[in-house]
């Protein structure tokens, strides 16, 4: 197959939110196969020569924030709001076409911008651009609007039905868990494939000890301090108060609770409440203030800053008490770094992940005495901890490795462009023993770009 130019589109590709992390993993796989990747968003930390920055595309742009304030939590919208939505849609549509033309894009990958309506004008502009240009598109869905209470009451149902997501013949839809697949089909009639979040389990992480030690000093950790790591953004659905409760019950001043990520898109009130809650319960809480970079981002812009790879080595235990997750990046990262963890039985975990056979400390919405006892047992027993983390790494290697992603992306590219490789093997998707058949069929002409 001839190398393709692939354009990633979202409101933001920056930092270590789940969408940005997964997009970089996809891009890494594509680049390994000789394809070129380019980036369109309202906030970017990618290679500037391969980026198309449009500030109006960011979900936190003032005009978009004003629109969201007018249409969510309300049942009617004014003509003024509609006019602004379409003005932004028109601008972004022009910018999208410029992006496609400048980098000669063959395939669009839309990361969550046709899924959750944080930026309605961007979703509308994407739907129209994809329909008019007929450009091959993968819509990668992380969390749908019907999964979030904040979007339940709205004044934009017409736009949601049109673009979140659109039903077009040149779009292949990808979801990250089975419930999303079923709900998407039930609500819209759209079929999809499941590609879970993955990590490179074929290659264990390489850690920079010097940078890791510098990070430890930067948050004033003493040599004998023990780190309970909460590797998530600070938003309500992460259930971080349960991590505070756990550290309190450990009753050992050496244990420090460290939150590695920044606040999310829901404001700072929850972070302020957590600080007060930890203080009231006598828990030493450290929120990392330094910007944490994405370890898969090869731009090098953050060479003087820390990545997740500098943080995980210091963790003695991981807390992941989320109420809801699309998949669970922190879970798979903890397994990758061979760290024991406490996880809440959120729906996707209970349905898609738990049956795989991981060895974890699991809570069911509340922190019981038995759960605290099991955490203490693991912290105090190196032998038990080693057995647990090795089991988890082996299980994850079978189900959540790059091999799974590599084969799925290759199959979709083949369907779009009718390249010379055809799958014949019935071996599991993560098997390296994929057999290909070379064909001499000429590929059809590429899509026609809109003028």
Name each model-derived stretch.
Residues 2-3, 29-31, 36-107, 292-293:
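A conserved catalytic-core segment of Leloir-type glycosyltransferases
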Residues 222, 268-310:
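Nucleotide-activated donor-binding/catalytic signature segment of Leloir-type glycosyltransferases, i.e.
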Residues 216-217, 221-238, 244-247, 257-259:
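Conserved donor-binding/catalytic core segment of Leloir-type glycosyltransferases
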Residues 146, 159-214:
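Donor nucleotide-sugar binding/catalytic pocket of nucleotide-sugar-dependent glycosyltransferases
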Residues 1-53, 135, 424-425, 430-451:
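N-terminal subdomain of nucleotide-sugar transferases
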Residues 380-421, 436:
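A charged, aromatic-enriched C-terminal amphipathic alpha-helix characteristic of glycosyltransferases
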């Amino acid at each position: 197959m001839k190398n393709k130019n692939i354009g990633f589109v979202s409101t933001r590709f920056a930092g270590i939110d789940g969408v940005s992390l997964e997009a970089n993993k996809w891009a890494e796989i594509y680049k390994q196969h000789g394809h070129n990747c380019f980036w369109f968003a309202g906030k970017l930390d990618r290679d500037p020569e391969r980026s198309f920055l449009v500030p109006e595309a960011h979900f936190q742009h003032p005009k978009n924030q004003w629109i969201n304030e007018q249409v969510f939590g309300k049942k009617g919208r004014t003509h003024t709001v509609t006019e602004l939505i379409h003005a932004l849609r028109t601008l972004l549509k022009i910018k999208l076409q410029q992006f496609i033309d400048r980098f000669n894009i063959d395939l669009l990958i839309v990361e969550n911008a046709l899924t959750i309506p944080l930026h309605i004008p961007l979703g509308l502009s994407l739907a129209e651009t994809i329909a008019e240009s007929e450009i091959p598109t993968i819509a990668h869905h992380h969390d749908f609007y019907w999964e979030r209470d904040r979007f339940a009451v709205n004044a934009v149902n017409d736009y949601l039905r049109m673009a979140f997501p659109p039903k077009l013949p040149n779009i292949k839809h990808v979801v990250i868990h089975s419930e999303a697949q079923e709900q998407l089909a039930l609500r819209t009639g759209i079929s999809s494939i499941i590609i879970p979040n993955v990590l490179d389990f074929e290659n264990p992480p390489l850690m920079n000890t010097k940078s890791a030690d510098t990070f430890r000093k930067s948050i004033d950790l003493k040599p004998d301090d023990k780190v309970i790591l909460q590797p998530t953004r600070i938003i309500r659905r992460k259930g971080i108060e349960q991590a505070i409760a756990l550290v309190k019950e450990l009753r050992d001043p050496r244990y420090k609770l460290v939150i590695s990520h920044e606040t999310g898109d829901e404001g700072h009130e929850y972070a302020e409440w957590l600080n007060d809650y930890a203080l009231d319960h006598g828990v030493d809480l450290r929120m990392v203030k330094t910007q944490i970079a994405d370890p898969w981002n090869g731009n090098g812009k953050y060479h003087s800053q820390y990545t997740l790879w500098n943080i995980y080595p210091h963790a003695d235990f991981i807390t992941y008490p989320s109420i809801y997750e699309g998949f669970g990046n922190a879970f798979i990262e903890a397994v990758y770094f061979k760290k024991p963890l406490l996880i809440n039985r959120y729906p996707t975990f209970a349905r898609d992940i738990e049956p795989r056979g991981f060895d974890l400390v699991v809570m069911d919405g509340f922190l019981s005495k038995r759960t605290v006892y099991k955490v203490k047992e693991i912290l105090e027993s190196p032998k038990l901890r080693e057995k647990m983390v090795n089991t988890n790494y082996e299980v994850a290697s079978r189900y959540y490795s790059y091999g799974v992603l590599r084969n799925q992306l290759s199959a979709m590219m083949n369907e779009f462009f009718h390249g010379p490789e055809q799958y014949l093997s019935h071996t599991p998707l993560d098997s390296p023993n994929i057999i290909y058949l070379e064909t001499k069929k000429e590929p059809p002409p590429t899509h026609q770009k809109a003028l």
